[in-house]
Amino acid sequence: MISKSRRSFIRLAAGTVGATVATSMLPSSIQAALAIPAHRRHGNLKDVEHVVILMQENRSFDHYFGTLKGVRGFGDRMAIPLPDGQRVWHQKGSKGEILPYHFDTSTTSAQRVDGTPHTWPDAQQAWNEGRMDKWLPAKTERSLGYYKEQDIAFQFAMANAFTICDAYHCSFQGGTNPNRLFLWTGTNDPLGQHGGPVTTNDHDSNGPVEQGYTWTTYPERLQAAGITWRVYQDMADNFSDNPLIGFRQYRAAAPDSPLIVNGLSTWKLDALKRDVLANSLPQVSWIVAPAKYSEHPGPSSPIWGAEYTSWVLDALTANPEVWSKTALLVMFDENDGFFDHVAPPAAPSLNKDGTLRGKTTADATLEWHTKGDIRYRNQPYGLGPRVPMYVISPWSKGGWVNSQVFDHTSVIRFLEQRFGVMEPNISPWRRAVCGDLTSAFNFANPNNEPFPELPDTSQADAIVASQIKLPKPKPPAVAAMPKQEMGIRPARALPYELGVHARYRSGGDALSLTFANTGKAGAVFQVFDLLDSENPPKRYTVGARKRLHDSFQGDASGDYHLEVHGPNGFLRVFRGNLRRDLAERKAPLPEVRIDYEPLFGNLRVQLINRGRHPVKLTVKDNVYRQGERRTVNVPPGQRREVRYSLRSSGNWYDFSVSAQGADSFLRRFSGRMEDGRSGFSDPGMGLGTLTF
């Protein structure tokens, strides 16, 4: 477990505005409740008897946690390339280049910063089919603003106290209502059969019975299965964030119908606390915050959102017995327009002739926009950018990070796993790629992880009032790359076992790649061609225990330079020249393949020479072994093996292979070997992008 000083957990946001505000612990009742052991009757998911879901508004992961240690933030060495060859941090607009910059709440009004464009058209523009190079034209310069721990102390403390998910994506490239529909129903009706496809905030308030959506929502499925549920909200002030109001069956329901009583009635946080104290908390609950506390930029602020979250915790922990059986999931519906550097996994884009730019083993029919606005016809709906996700429960304490790919449908899938109520609206592609959140919990041995102190939020109004008078934040005159705090945090085991293997295609006119997935979860490989600035990356969705093959041409001179990006820092780099490497088979023909040996903690590197002449290959460590080099002579037609123990690096690896006599040849392999056990985050996080 990663320790942190007591003082850092009680640092208050007020300190950043020069005000002297007394700090204190959260109420002692909360501390006492959080310290009690988790309910452990079965030692598995059945111990969770209540799931509470709080979806807040409009913050991206980098915007909040790019500087948090031990997560995939600003120190990511595997940041994707832009079409101009620079890394994704270097966004360009009409005023030139801007890097992510600090929303300093001590000198600016950043607590109440204005929002940015966040609709389907501008989200598609910023993403740009995966190029990720249009954030400034689409989202304004505010999109690159981010906070530090001193600005959002409560949010950092939550991440350090419980579990933060750093690969949780919003479901849809766009705004509030479509994303909330994925959380409550698993879909946006992509085929337009029941009032969709939903790409805007239509029907987010009450309307005529004959208007609205008609597909089945997940609360209805819970009701039919006898699972208790409720939406806690103030119907007079829920910021239009309850999407159930847009469904005809809810609009037409009788006043005493469960759809009205539990879905469209006022149940504020005091009602939540009463239900907790009375041991009548439903099995599944959704919470919708008022506008002021929604965390939405403009009408709300991070510290108001923190205050509301602390009230939710206060209510849930008022009865320690109930809290010992409760999981609270807190996420954000979308990123607003705030920048996040990770290219979202998505179904393949389509070429102009309608063919896929990539491949998929999972049915992605429901992932493309085929109805409605022709401007975005055939564009993938998602996934969208990463958003923060906290898993708060007695089974997820200890400052963990979980890096499995999730989206809003993952919340429904968690409920499926716990209560057995299936949601057929979730697409096959999302089921293949997005997990069910169970990997974020420790049910077997949950009670050995202490709970650190949390900041007080009682002075939120005073802090916001003092900051609102300060100047608005703006980019600095001289751009500089932000620094992520160095350090590690405990990391949950993931279900990935991925590989990409290269070989020259027979005939020598292309490089053939095999995308192999021998793990338990699907993954998206994104292939960036650094010599092709015109086309978007190709994407390959490979389901569990499946593989795909494809070939890649070189440029006019035979050069090729490919980067393959996957989940949790998975990276493969392939560089060389097809003509020089293959001309009359006189040049060396090296190939490199790696295999995992998790039982022994080893990585096996196979160095292969398919040419007619000997080749000398040098294997160089890039991060974890102080630049160690091993040079191996490989005779023609043979192979040699090199093994690396990964135990000292927590199974993380990053090395490159070059070939004497083939100057352009380079292979790079980076990632983590999963062995079914929890470990720790990448010790090399924070070093920045490596160049070769």
Curated annotation (Swiss-Prot):
It catalyses: a 1,2-diacyl-sn-glycero-3-phosphocholine + H2O = phosphocholine + a 1,2-diacyl-sn-glycerol + H(+). Predicted to be exported by the Tat system. The position of the signal peptide cleavage has not been experimentally proven. Keywords: Hydrolase, Signal. GO terms for biological process: lipid catabolic process; protein secretion by the type II secretion system. Pfam families: Phosphoesterase, PLipase_C_C. InterPro entries: Alkaline_phosphatase_core_sf, PC-PLC, Phosphoesterase, PLipase_C_C, TAT_signal. The keyword DNA-binding does not apply. GO terms for molecular function: lipase activity; phosphatidylcholine phospholipase C activity. Its EC number is 3.1.4.3. Residues 1-35 form the signal peptide. Belongs to the bacterial phospholipase C family. Hydrolyzes phosphatidylserine as well as phosphatidylcholine. This is Non-hemolytic phospholipase C. The lineage of its organism: Bacteria, Pseudomonadati, Pseudomonadota, Gammaproteobacteria, Pseudomonadales. The gene is plcN.
